Regions:
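NAD(P)+-binding Rossmann beta1-loop-alpha1 motif at the extreme N-terminus of oxidoreductases
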Residues: 1-53
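Short beta->alpha hinge that forms the Motif I/post-I loop of the SAM-binding pocket
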Residues: 33, 66, 91-93
Length: 93
């Protein structure tokens, strides 16, 4: 399963860490506005690869874990490229 996580903060990072337990063969892709967060997530093994918007259509699941004030900015980009069978989930507070 290919999983894309948009937002690698507390919620997105925690999901990335825990999803490997029930789905050990999943491949996790991550996207974050902060290059530092992205590099740290790769370094810690939370994600396997960096996610590009152009690759979102290849994901089976996209988890959007960004603050609500960024949601209106990035959600159209995600929905414009998402595959027909891709599940998109927003987790935010």
């Amino acid at each position: 399963m290919k999983i894309g996580i948009v937002g690698l903060g507390l919620m997105g990072g925690s999901f990335a860490l825990d999803i490997k337990i029930p789905y050990p063969n999943s491949v996790i892709y991550g996207l974050d506005m902060s290059k530092e967060n992205l590099n740290k997530a790769i370094e810690l093994g939370l994600i396997d690869h960096q996610l590009e918007y152009s690759k979102i259509s290849e994901m089976d699941l996209v988890l959007v874990a960004v603050p609500v004030n960024y949601l209106l900015e990035i959600l159209p980009k995600i929905l414009d490229t998402v595959g027909q069978k891709t599940l998109v989930i927003y987790v935010g507070s």
